[in-house]
């Protein structure tokens, strides 16, 4: 399966279930979507253009067993990312799981490009020129997730080794570090 490691973990978690509903936020080129569907999951996608719009969750139903975002929550300001996380939490069923990546302050791109705010920088060149990226330290990311989720695991990974060129058109990432988060929605947030 040429899918992101978090997509693989999601499939392993939901293995054996058929027609289980999964929300994929910012589905990119569809690599993860294909892997999820091949596993028999019923996938609703929010494409990249919609994810970047003013109302990315308009028309998205609720009741999903899991949500996956392997790059959509890297983009925007911390406030934008927090809003997306809240909207995802509202769309998960009881015990629904979030599998997502977030930018780390250890990423080589942190502090590079145009400063949007203390935690957000827009790339000055390359595939993502002008695209704002939010970066978090562990405490900031825990604070962002805690109102909505019980964190199961939160690990930093070298994205160069995990994603490489398949996730970025022109060249592999260089010095990219992402948080991989797996979390269960809190009952009070549904």
PLM regions: where:
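Short His-Asn-centered micro-motif
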Residues: 26, 46, 70-71, 92
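Structured loop/turn residues at beta-strand edges in well-structured enzyme cores
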Residues: 17, 62, 79
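Class I (Rossmann-like) S-adenosyl-L-methionine-dependent methyltransferase catalytic domain
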Residues: 1-58, 97-190
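A short glycine-rich, Lys/Arg-flanked "PGG" loop and its adjoining helix->strand segment in the class I
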Residues: 82-94
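A short acidic, Gly/Pro-enriched loop at the edge of an enzyme's catalytic core
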Residues: 57-67
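A short SAM/SAH-binding and catalytic strip from SAM-dependent methyltransferases
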Residues: 65-80
């Amino acid at each position: 399966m040429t899918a992101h490691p978090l997509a693989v973990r999601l499939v392993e978690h939901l293995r054996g279930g058929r027609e289980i509903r999964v929300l994929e936020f910012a589905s990119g080129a569809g690599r993860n979507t294909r892997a999820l569907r091949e596993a028999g999951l019923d996938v609703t996608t929010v494409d990249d253009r919609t994810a970047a719009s003013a109302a990315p969750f308009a028309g998205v139903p609720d009741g999903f067993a899991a949500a996956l975002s392997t790059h959509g929550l890297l983009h925007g300001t911390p406030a934008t990312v927090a809003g997306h996380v809240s909207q995802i939490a509202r769309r998960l069923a009881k015990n629904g799981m979030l599998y997502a990546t977030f930018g780390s302050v250890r990423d080589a791109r942190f502090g590079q490009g145009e400063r949007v705010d203390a935690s957000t920088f827009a790339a000055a060149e390359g595939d993502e020129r002008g695209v704002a990226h939010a970066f978090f330290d562990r405490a900031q990311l825990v604070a962002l997730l805690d109102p909505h989720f019980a964190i199961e695991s939160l690990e930093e990974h070298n994205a160069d080794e995990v994603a490489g060129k398949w996730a970025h058109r022109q060249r592999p990432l260089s010095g990219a570090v992402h948080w991989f988060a797996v979390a269960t929605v809190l009952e009070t947030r549904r």
